Amino acid sequence: MADPARAKRLAKRISTIVASAIEYEIKDPRLAGVTITDSKVTNDLHDATLYYTVLGRSLDEEPDYAGAAAALEKAKGVLRTKVGAGTGVRFTPTLAFVRDTVPDTAHRMEELLARARAADEDLARVREGAKHAGDADPYRVSGVEEEAGGSGEVQAEFDAEDTGDRNRQDD
């Protein structure tokens, strides 16, 4: 069993070899928008899982996921041969291709966040012209300011409290 660091290095090398082969050597038109996003190799170095995503030909066109999966399955033997020649390991790992759903999930999250921002903006527009129901301060007791005379006499009573230190001048 190989150490995990070697498995990570091999996974990165396999990812580079397969991506290069898909881009430059394999002439299947269904692989035109395929990008290898990640790869993982088991610790015994016998199995490699390659994650891929497919881009459409334009922004409006939906990617051909089924066509890309079929093309990768068809090219699996050629790709494994290239991996064996490029890595130099004793046993060439078997390749498995899995569609990467992270970009789709990220796009979905961006849509949800945009929808939440729009709802917040709508709520802010509604709040602009809104007024509070009832009085401005329902707990305000009217007339307290008038009893104190508004000159701070109430505050002066509370300043001269006895602290129990025999009436020092510092109080």
UniProtKB/Swiss-Prot annotation:
Biological process, per Gene Ontology: maturation of SSU-rRNA
KW Transmembrane helix (keyword) present: no
Keywords linked to the UniProt accession: Cytoplasm, Ribosome biogenesis
Disordered: region residues: 126-171
UniProt main location, coarse: cytoplasm
Protein role: One of several proteins that assist in the late maturation steps of the functional core of the 30S ribosomal subunit. Associates with free 30S ribosomal subunits (but not with 30S subunits that are part of 70S ribosomes or polysomes). Required for efficient processing of 16S rRNA. May interact with the 5'-terminal helix region of 16S rRNA.
Family of this protein: Belongs to the RbfA family.
Name of the protein in its database record: Ribosome-binding factor A
